[in-house]
Curated annotation (Swiss-Prot):
It is a single-pass membrane protein. The lineage of its organism: Eukaryota, Viridiplantae, Streptophyta, Embryophyta, Tracheophyta. It is found in: Membrane. Keywords: Flavonoid biosynthesis, Heme, Iron, Membrane, Metal-binding, Monooxygenase, NADP, Oxidoreductase, Transmembrane, Transmembrane helix. Pathway: Flavonoid metabolism. This is Flavonoid 3',5'-hydroxylase CYP75B138. It catalyses: a 3',5'-unsubstituted flavanone + 2 reduced [NADPH--hemoprotein reductase] + 2 O2 = a 3',5'-dihydroxyflavanone + 2 oxidized [NADPH--hemoprotein reductase] + 2 H2O + 2 H(+); (2S)-naringenin + 2 reduced [NADPH--hemoprotein reductase] + 2 O2 = (2S)-dihydrotricetin + 2 oxidized [NADPH--hemoprotein reductase] + 2 H2O + 2 H(+); (2R,3R)-dihydrokaempferol + 2 reduced [NADPH--hemoprotein reductase] + 2 O2 = (2R,3R)-dihydromyricetin + 2 oxidized [NADPH--hemoprotein reductase] + 2 H2O + 2 H(+); kaempferol + 2 reduced [NADPH--hemoprotein reductase] + 2 O2 = myricetin + 2 oxidized [NADPH--hemoprotein reductase] + 2 H2O + 2 H(+). It comes from Crocosmia x crocosmiiflora (Montbretia). The keyword Membrane applies. GO terms for cellular component: membrane. Pfam families: p450. Expressed in young cromes. The chain crosses the membrane at residues 6-26.
Length: 527
C-alpha cells in the first residue's frame, strides 16, 4: 500500500503538531516547579538546542559559556544537558561524583560497544568495577606498565627504524598513521601477546608489507570512524520517538562499522588464543580464564564482554594517544625554537648514540612541560565523556534535575583567558618552575588541566597515556628533525579540528623525518 501526497502531508502535519504540543507540555512542566535552573540559550521546539551545536559542539558550547557563564543548561530534545566550563564548577560536580558516575543511554554504546557490555559505557556498579580491576592489574596499573615497558620501547624502536628507512625515499610520512600503527602494536602485544601488524614490524618492504600497510590504514579508518560516530549528537538519543527513523543515518553507520570491527575482533582474538603460551598472564588470557564466572551483577563474563573490552582498549587506547602525539609534533614544527630547546635537553641527558627510554623522561622537565601544554591546547577528549545525574541535586546555587546529562568542556577550560594568559599561544614555560602551572599535573586532581577527566570514571588508561605520549614525543624529536613538504610553511599548517570523542586533526600532518642520531641507534633488537 502506497501513501498519497495528501497522506504524507497529513502525516507530517500530525508529527509537527504533536511535537510542538509535547515540547510545550514538557517545557511548561519544567518551568512550573519554581526551581532555579542554570541559565542557557533558548532552543527550538522538539529539538531544543541540538541544531545550535553544529559540527564542533565543544566550540559552540564554549561560545555559549561566554554568554551564560561557566554553568549552563541546554535542552537537547527531552534531555537536560548541563555543561561545566570552569575548573571551580567542574570540581563541584567531580570531587564528590557519586551522583554523576552513571552514563546516559546512547546509540554508540548500544550499537558499537556490544550493547553496554564494554568498560567505558557500562553502568556503574560491580560489573564495571570488575572490568576496571582486571584492566588495571593486567594492563593499565603501575606494575603491569612496568612489566610491559620493554614492549613499548621495542615498538618505538621499530617506529624509529621505519622512519629512518622511509627518510631515504624522499616522501613525507603521514605522522598520525605511523603513530597509530606503533600504538596498536604496542598495546596489542601487552594486552594479547602479539602484534596486530606483524609484517610492518618485521619490515623489509615487498608486497606483503604493502598489503599490511593497507590493512593498517583500513584499521585506523575504522577506529577513527568509531570514535567519530560515538561523538555524534544523535537526534534519536534525545527525541526518543524519532529514534526509529534514524534521521541522520548515524545508527546505520554505527551498525556497519560494528560489523566490520566484530569480524576483526573474532579473527584476531582467535589467532591470539591459538598462539597463546601456557600460563600466559596477559589481559586477554586472564579474561578467557574468567569466562562463565560471575560478573558481580547477576550475569557472567562472556565472549561478548571480552570483545567489548578489547574494542574499548584497542580503540580508545590507540586513537587518543596517536592523535595527541600528532598534535604535539605539529605544534613543535610550528615553533622551531621550542623544538630546538627540547632537542638540546634530550641530547644533554641521553646523547645521540641511543634512543630515549621511559626512564629518561623524569630527567626531561622541558619535554614534560611541552606535553602538558599540548594537553592544555589539544586534549584528547574535548568534552568529557557524558555522565548522568542519578538524583536531583544543587550545584552552585542551581537545581540540577534527575537524569541530567553532564559535560565538562575540557577544551574550553584549556583556552580560557581568565585561567591561561594568551591561551592561543603554545608556551610550555607555563609549566616550568615559576610558571603559573608548575604545580599542575594531569591525573584528575587539578581541574585546570584534566585531559583524562577526573573522579570515579577518569580514563582507565591515564597512566599508560602519560607514559606513551611522553616517550613517543621524545623519540620523534630526539631521533629526527622534521621538514614540511615542498611549498608548505609552518605558518600555513592546517590546524582545523575534526570533532569526535577524540579530537583529530582535520588534515593529517605530513612531514619528512630527517635522522639526527648515530646510525646504530636505529637498529632495534626485535622480538
Amino acid at each position: 500500500m502506497t501513501m498519497t501526497s495528501l497522506d504524507i502531508i497529513l502525516f507530517i502535519s500530525a508529527i509537527v503538531f504533536l511535537s510542538i504540543y509535547y515540547y510545550n507540555l514538557f517545557s511548561n512542566a519544567k518551568r512550573s516547579n519554581g526551581l532555579k535552573l542554570p541559565p542557557g540559550p533558548k532552543g527550538y521546539p522538539v529539538l531544543g538546542n541540538l541544531p545550535q551545536l553544529g559540527a564542533k559542539p565543544h566550540q559552540a558550547l564554549q561560545a555559549f559559556s561566554r554568554v551564560y557563564g561557566p554553568l549552563m543548561r541546554l535542552r537537547l530534545g527531552s534531555v537536560d544537558l548541563v555543561v561545566a566550563s570552569s575548573p571551580s564548577v567542574a570540581a563541584q560536580f567531580l570531587k564528590n561524583d557519586s551522583n554523576f558516575c552513571a552514563r546516559p543511554p546512547n546509540s554508540g554504546a548500544e550499537h558499537m560497544a556490544f550493547n553496554y557490555h564494554d568498560l567505558v559505557f557500562a553502568p556503574y556498579g560491580p560489573r564495571w568495577r570488575l572490568l576496571r580491576k582486571l584492566s588495571a592489574v593486567h594492563l593499565l596499573g603501575p606494575k603491569a606498565l612496568d612489566d610491559n615497558q620493554n614492549v613499548r620501547e621495542e615498538e618505538l624502536a621499530v617506529l624509529a627504524r621505519m622512519l629512518y628507512e622511509r627518510s631515504r625515499g624522499g616522501e613525507p610520512v603521514n605522522v598520525g598513521k605511523e603513530m597509530h600503527v606503533c600504538s596498536t602494536n604496542a598495546l596489542s602485544r601487552a594486552m594479547m601477546g602479539r602484534r596486530v601488524f606483524e609484517k610492518l614490524a618485521v619490515g623489509g618492504g615487498g608486497v606483503e608489507e604493502e598489503e599490511e600497510m593497507k590493512k593498517a590504514e583500513e584499521f585506523k579508518d575504522m577506529v577513527v570512524e568509531v570514535m567519530t560516530l560515538a561523538g555524534v549528537f544523535n537526534i534519536g538519543d534525545f527525541v526518543p520517538w524519532l529514534k526509529p527513523f534514524d534521521i541522520q543515518g548515524v545508527v546505520r553507520k554505527m551498525k556497519r562499522v560494528h560489523r566490520r570491527y566484530n569480524v576483526f575482533l573474532d579473527k584476531f582474538i582467535a589467532e591470539c588464543r591459538s598462539s597463546a603460551k601456557p600460563g600466559a598472564n596477559d589481559l586477554l588470557s586472564v579474561l578467557i580464564g574468567q569466562r562463565g564466572k560471575s560478573d558481580g551483577s547477576g550475569g557472567e563474563i562472556t565472549d561478548t564482554a571480552i570483545k567489548a573490552l578489547v574494542l574499548n582498549l584497542l580503540t580508545a587506547g590507540t586513537d587518543t594517544s596517536s592523535s595527541t602525539i600528532e598534535w604535539a609534533l605539529t605544534e613543535l614544527i610550528r615553533h622551531p625554537d621550542i623544538l630546538k630547546k627540547a632537542q638540546q635537553e634530550i641530547d644533554s641527558a641521553v646523547g645521540r648514540d641511543r634512543l630515549v627510554t621511559e626512564s629518561d623522561v623524569p630527567k626531561l622537565p622541558y619535554l614534560q612541560a611541552i606535553v602538558k601544554e599540548n594537553f592544555r591546547m589539544h586534549p584528547a577528549t574535548p568534552l568529557s565523556l557524558p555522565r548522568m545525574s542519578i538524583e536531583e541535586c544543587d550545584i552552585g546555587g542551581y537545581h540540577i534535575p534527575k537524569n541530567s546529562t553532564l559535560f565538562v568542556n575540557i577544551w574550553a577550560m584549556g583556552r580560557d583567558p581568565s585561567i591561561w594568559p594568551d591561551p592561543m599561544e603554545f608556551r610550555p614555560s607555563r609549566f616550568l618552575p615559576g610558571g603559573q602551572g608548575e604545580h599542575l599535573e594531569v591525573r584528575g586532581n587539578h581541574f585546570e588541566l584534566m585531559p583524562f577527566g577526573a573522579g570515579r570514571r577518569i580514563c582507565a588508561g591515564t597512566s599508560m597515556g602519560i607514559r606513551v605520549v611522553h616517550s613517543t614525543v621524545a623519540t620523534l624529536i630526539h631521533a629526527f628533525d622534521w621538514k614540511l613538504p615542498e611549498g608548505l610553511t609552518a605558518e600555513k599548517i592546517d590546524m582545523e579540528e575534526a570533532f569526535g570523542i577524540s579530537l583529530q586533526k582535520a588534515i593529517p600532518l605530513m612531514a619528512h623525518p630527517i635522522p639526527r642520531l648515530a646510525p646504530k641507534a636505529y637498529s632495534p633488537k626485535m622480538k
